[in-house]
Regions:
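FIC/Doc superfamily catalytic core
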Residues: 1-187
């Protein structure tokens, strides 16, 4: 039995309330009447990918999945969190596929960096148009560059955290019957 999904039935906008009380709309999600169709297409793309270069590259494939989900905006709440989770899952799936690994989850989660850079994140999404009349190559490239910057920033954050952890632990050799093991021991 196929699971059933309940998508929003009202229009969705992403925006911010200004100090004077007016709302600055960044972008609108898909029209409520189109959400089921768009999500059906999205799920097919997610599951099957494609034959283009984008779908042979873990970074590009996961970034596109992230973006498409946000632009459809299928739920009344939690779309950003869900998009970032889908990004991580797709990235892990693609790493496993392309590099024949068996990761359970991506070792790198960019949510923290995205939340710190939320204004730029929203602007990058807002700048991308999905219509035949507009060539969004420049904006799509800006999206990819932004996500790449978030990966770099998150790697930097992770390295700083590891250095702090490393300074409070020492590595100690543990003799065993047939081999030597190393373990972390708190200083």
């Amino acid at each position: 039995m196929e699971p059933t999904y309940t998508y929003r039935s009202t229009e969705a906008t992403v925006g911010r309330k200004s100090p004077n009380g007016s709302i600055n709309i960044f972008w609108r999600g898909a029209q409520a009447k189109d959400v089921n169709k768009f999500m059906s297409d999205f799920l097919n793309i997610y599951k099957q990918g494609g034959t283009s270069l984008i779908y042979s590259n873990p970074f590009l494939a996961s970034s596109i999945i992230h973006l498409l989900f946000l632009r459809i905006h299928p739920y009344t709440d939690g779309n950003g969190r869900t998009a970032r989770i889908l990004h991580n899952i797709k990235f892990t799936e693609m790493i496993n596929k392309v590099y024949s690994t068996r990761l359970k989850l991506s070792p790198l989660n960019i949510s923290e960096s995205i939340l710190v850079n939320k204004i730029t994140y929203v602007k990058r999404i807002d700048n991308i148009y999905f219509d035949i009349k507009h060539d969004s190559n420049e904006e799509i490239n800006a999206w990819f560059n932004f996500i790449l910057d978030m990966v770099k920033e998150q790697l930097y954050r992770a390295m700083n955290k590891l250095e702090k952890i490393d300074s409070s632990f020492i590595i100690e050799d543990v003799p065993t019957s047939n081999m030597r093991l190393s373990r972390l021991k708190h200083r």
